[in-house]
Structures are given as structure tokens and as C-alpha cells.
Amino acid sequence: MFNKFNTKPLWEVSKTLSSVAQGFEPADMVIINSRLINVCTREVIENTDVAVSCGRIALVGDAKHCIGENTEVIDAKGQYIAPGFLDGHIHVESSMLSVSEYARSVVPHGTVGIYMDPHEICNVLGLNGVRYMIEDGKGTPLKNMVTTPSCVPAVPGFEDTGAAVGPEDVRETMKWDEIVGLGEMMNFPGILYSTDHAHGVVGETLKASKTVTGHYSLPETGKGLNGYIASGVRCCHESTRAEDALAKMRLGMYAMFREGSAWHDLKEVSKAITENKVDSRFAVLISDDTHPHTLLKDGHLDHIIKRAIEEGIEPLTAIQMVTINCAQCFQMDHELGSITPGKCADIVFIEDLKDVKITKVIIDGNLVAKGGLLTTSIAKYDYPEDAMNSMHIKNKITPDSFNIMAPNKEKITARVIEIIPERVGTYERHIELKVKDDKVQCDPNKDVLKAVVFERHHETGKAGYGFVKGFGIKRGAMAATVAHDAHNLLVIGTNDEDMALAANTLIECGGGMVAVQDGKVLGLVPLPIAGLMSNKPLEEMAEMVEKLDSAWKEIGCDIVSPFMTMALIPLACLPELRLTNRGLVDCNKFEFVSLFVEE
């Protein structure tokens, strides 16, 4: 497939590149005195030059004959050079940044391309939202390669979203220049039980000869995993155990090792390589979801490479996992992923392999970052009005909106969602709760909080009620419109008054995340773009998120990235128990269940 993200297609400049390589024409740029990280052979080649022309690599080796009067010569001074880093699975919306601001944030860290799955904004605004993010990315040097959201809604019939995407929509988007594949196929039950919708969206992608990305979170790695892969799914980022990743790689599926703000799977999953001594060509490092304070403090793929090295993965192997392996996964290694003739001139300068310190970044033959700062301008994009006005709540939310009734009872046993810190799964617990004035009470002493999800897209007035455990909050409430994947309004708390204040605060500011205690807003992150993102700069967003994080701790929650963990409570494609605006969902059986356990 032609990668339209390059400056020029190879067929258009092939003669020039061949001439430059042979010294018949001068190069635009020559890098000298480098230590080349060759990801094709997993070796470092000392004292190597690279000649660049037309935004592509013309020659790797001795390039003295490629230097002309106007050739820009960059002396690497013995630094390593590697192919630009690629993030194979990322939801930009989770950064809370616009695409352009996200690019400004990650490019200086060596990221030259992302495979963006914009299913968050698509759940709110439909394919219009995808187009908005594509347009936002066009003014940046970052290669914004997009996968069409496959599961909008994530699990049909269990929640209300702002839009829906079907096979005919996927067929249309496969004609878009920016689309390189299908976003994560979360509806693995639909694949395994042969639903027309699930196989239809996969089929339209395969017809276009593009990559189908996956989401297989079941621990079963036999018939189910084989059936899932056989349908055409090429990769999966949902491995949380080494044996999961190893099973996928053995079946020819690219196992994506995730290390984001909340999901720290790398420590365990890296053992698939380090303990089994298998070939790593089917292993890819990805971030999935990264918050602004993480980007500001730790970086992006440079940090994930460093983490992989800390877990025992060889440095060159880790770099392969964000370059050639990723490019091959998306069938784009003829364009990206290696410093070899004909490929995009996307080059990262690394001072130290252990610390993965990035000093320069070149994209398409242009120096775009140096010393941790962007050296090129980025155009600002203004999102349309429908993106900035996405809170459509039918009824006024009051403390009474949070009543959970159980007439003629003194106590009752409820199904409670227990979170697993730093993991995407949950447990179903059965816990006895008190009833007062016919209303079921939460129990902060047992770490059991009330949870309500309000539909916010079509003013249906639907709301789902439940209880959650594991946040540690003793007094207060929190709310978010970042609530995967339908992104309805999720409110959690110990009392109805604070819960109502939290909900109404977000309605007034157009969406976001908030923490409340005793009638006071302690921390607020407004996200006016679809209730998911902001047009504020990284530094300002990181400061607001840090303040919100402190507010969470103030009300008693000390888990890592609590807002990310909270955001997954409605995601009905992940085991074990979830809450959507339609009710409580058993995600093993994929059926609604009663909030109360029958006695």
C-alpha cells in the first residue's frame, strides 16, 4: 500500500534516489559518523553514513560521494541512530490532548508515527469525529496513521453511544487516504459466534488489503484464540500474562506489549521473550492510553523502550519492537521501520542506549526536534461546534437522581464491581448492604461506593445503577465523561449530594473529570472537545491532571491513575462485571444481570 504520509511516493523519486546513491546527484542531507542500529539484522554498525534525498534514504554506508555543495551534513559524533519510533496502538483521546498538541508532545521523544484508533471520539461524534482528528493531525510532522473504529458501540445492545459504525461505514473509510486498517476488534464474541456485523467489518478491511487490529482479552488460548486469528485479526494488545503473549506469537499474531499510564503489563508480558528465549519478531511495544502528566514526566516510546530494557529485553530487540516489527505488523515495512535505501528518512539520534536519551529527530528528511524541543511549527486546528457541544442530558440531575430503591428491606446483597489496580479486569463480588428508607446505602467502611452511568448523547434519560469497590474513598464523589467506550457520564461517590455536584459540574463545562468533597470541587479537568479532549497545551493539562490526582488522594483514593481505572468501569467487552447506562453486565456471559443477588 502507498503510505500517503510520506513527502513523496517511492515511484516518483526512485530515479533520483538511485542517482544519489551512486554519486550522480548530491544528497539533500548526509549523516556522518553514526553508530547505526540496523533493525534488519539486530546489530550496531559503527562509523556509518546515511544519505537522504526527497525525504527518503538513498544510501547507507560510506556517503562521501553523496555530499554536494548544498548538502546538509549532520555529524552524529558517534551517537546511535535508529529508525523513528512507531506506536502501534494508541488512543490519542486518552492523552486529553488535541492531535496537534499530542504531536508536539511526543515527536521530541523519537515518535515519528502513530497508529491511531480514534474510537473514543467516534463513539461520541461518529465518523465526523474521526475526520476532525485526521484534519487536526495534518498540520503536524507526526505520521498520523488511522485505523477505522471497529466496535462502535463496543458491544452492541449493552450501551447507548453517540453513533454506530457498520460494515458499510468501514467500506467507505477504507477509501480514505489516511486509513491504514481496522481499529481493535473488541467484539471477540461476535467473531467467535460468527455474527454478520463483526465479520462484516473485518471482511471490508481484508477486501481493502489492510490490517485488522485486535482485542482478545480471554485467557483461553486454544480454540477461541485460533478462531479469532483465523478470521483475519493480525495483532492484539490485551495480553496481561506472558503465556497469553507467547501463545499469540506462536500463532503468527503480533503480540503488543502495553505500558501506559495505568496499564503496566510490560513487567509480566516481557517474560514471554526473556524467559522463553523465542524470536521477538512478532512482539511490538505500544502505549495504548497515556495521560498528559505521564507524557510530560516520562516521555513516550523512549520511556517504554527503557522499561523494556529494565525488564531484561535487549536494547536492540526493544528498538525493533517499536520500528520494523510494528511496520511489518501493518504491512508497511516497505515504507517505514528501518534505515535502509528507499525507506522514509525517519531517524532518531540516541545518545545512550540504556537511558534512551533522544537528542535529534528527523522525519521525512527534515530535522523536527532537537534537545527535547520541537524545531518546526504546528498548525492549530479549531474543532467544529458539534464537537464542542456534546453534553446532552435529558433530565436535571439532583441528589434524588442517585437513589437505588429496595422497598421493604433492611439489608440486601448486591453485585459489586471490584476493580483490580493497574489491570483492566474486574471481579464480581457479592456484598451485603444496608437499606434505609427503602434506599440501598453504599458502605465506605467496606470500600463500597455507589455508581451511576447517565446517557449523554441523545437525551434518552437512561441511567444504569450499581456499586464499585477498590477506590478507597471515604467521603466525596468523582465523575467523568471519559468512560469507555460509550463515554456517557459516569459518577461514583459516597453521598448523593456530592455526586450531583460532580455530575452538574461536568455538564456545565462540556465534559471532563472532577473530584468533589463536602460540596466543594477539589479538582477539575475540563475536556470540551467531545467531553474527551482539550485544546490546552500539554504543560497546562498535566498541571490540571496532577491537581485532580491530588484531589483523588485527598478524598482517600491512592491507586495508580484512578481516573483511568474508573474510566473502564462501563467497558462491557472486558471481564468480569461492568456497568453501562443500560445496567449491570456480566461480561463473561455477555448478558445483563440484576444488581441484587437472589436469595
Curated annotation (Swiss-Prot):
Disulfide bond sites: none
GO biological process, one term: adenine catabolic process
Domain of life: Bacteria
EC assignment: 3.5.4.2
UniProt entry keywords in alphabetical sequence: Hydrolase, Manganese
Example of a GO MF term: adenine deaminase activity
Matching Pfam families: Adenine_deam_C, Amidohydro_1
InterPro entries: Adenine_deam, Adenine_deam_C, Amidohydro-rel, Metal-dep_hydrolase_composite, Metal_Hydrolase
Principal EC category: hydrolase
Cofactors: Mn(2+)
Reactions catalysed, as given in the entry: adenine + H2O + H(+) = hypoxanthine + NH4(+)
Homology family: Belongs to the metallo-dependent hydrolases superfamily. Adenine deaminase family.
PANTHER family named in the record: ADENINE DEAMINASE, N-ACETYLGLUCOSAMINE-6-PHOSPHATE DEACETYLASE
UniProt name for this protein: Adenine deaminase
Recorded name of the encoding gene: ade
